[in-house]
Amino acid sequence: MRIIETVSEMQQQADDWRRAGKRIGFVPTMGYFHEGHLMLMRKVRGEADMVVASIFVNPAQFGPNEDLATYPRDLDRDLRLAGEVGVDVAFVPQVGEMYPDGYQTYVEVTKVTAPLCGRSRPLFFRGVATVVVKLFHIVKPHVAVFGEKDYQQLVTIRRMVKDLNLDIEILGHPIVREPDDLAMSSRNKYLTPEQRPLALRLSRALKAARARVALGERNGSVILKEVKELLDAGGEVRIDYAELRDPATMEEVGSMDGPSLLALAVFVGTTRLIDNCILRPAA
C-alpha cells in the first residue's frame, strides 16, 4: 500500500489511474479504524479497480467546544489495517495541506442539514461538505462509500453531489455493530465500563420502536414518547435529539405513511453518540 501525503501527488496518481482506464473507489475517514471503516473499504474494493482511503481529522467540522484535540488517533495501526483489507493508497494529508494559509472557501448544503446534528452542531455539515468536495477533487473517485450510521451526512453528500453535478456514485453501507449491539464508532473509546450499558439504550430504543411499528403503530408521537422514556431512564444520559424524519428530505414526520428515519443522539457523560434505523410500516 502506498502512502501519499500531498494533494499534488494524490491528484497525479488519480490522473494516472484514470488514463489507464482504472475505476477509482474512495472511503474518506478521520482514522482510528474499527470494523465499520474496514467494511466500507471491503465494499468499495468490490466496486473499483483501485481503492483510496483518506485519513484526515478535519478541523472544519468540529465546533469550538468539541473534541478535536482529543479525537482518538492511531495512524500506524490504521495504515496496517487499511493495507490488510486491500487499500491501494492511503491519503494522509496534514491540516496545512488541506487548508493552507489564506484558505476561505466553504461549501454549504441547506435544508437537509438544518435539523438533527445540524441544529446541535451548526458548523458540522459545512465542514463535512467542504472537506468531502475537496477530497473528491483530489482523489477523483468514480465511486465513494459512506456509512449509514451518519445517515444525515450520507443524505447531505448525496444532495451535494447531485446539486454540484459531480460524476461520482455514492453508496451507503449499513450500520456495523459491536457484539452487544452498540453502533461502532471511534468515540466508543471514550466510554467507561460503567457508561457502556447506558450507551446500549440507543439500540434498545430502536428495537422497541421497530416492534411498535410491527404491531401497527403509525403515530410518530407515540413512538417517540416510548423511545425518549427508554433513553432518559436515569444515569448520566442526556438526550440531544430523538426524531422521526423523512429519509430523503430530512423533513419531520408525524404520521408514518411510509419508511421513516428514526434518528437518535445522546450524551453518555460527555460522549456524544448517534444511532438510527429506518422504520418501515407494513403495507
Swiss-Prot record:
Reactions the enzyme catalyzes: (R)-pantoate + beta-alanine + ATP = (R)-pantothenate + AMP + diphosphate + H(+)
Residues that bind (R)-pantoate: 61, 153
Record Pfam families: Pantoate_ligase (PF02569)
Gene Ontology terms describing biological process: pantothenate biosynthetic process
Miscellaneous section: The reaction proceeds by a bi uni uni bi ping pong mechanism.
Family: Belongs to the pantothenate synthetase family.
Protein name in the entry: Pantothenate synthetase
Organism: Syntrophobacter fumaroxidans (strain DSM 10017 / MPOB)
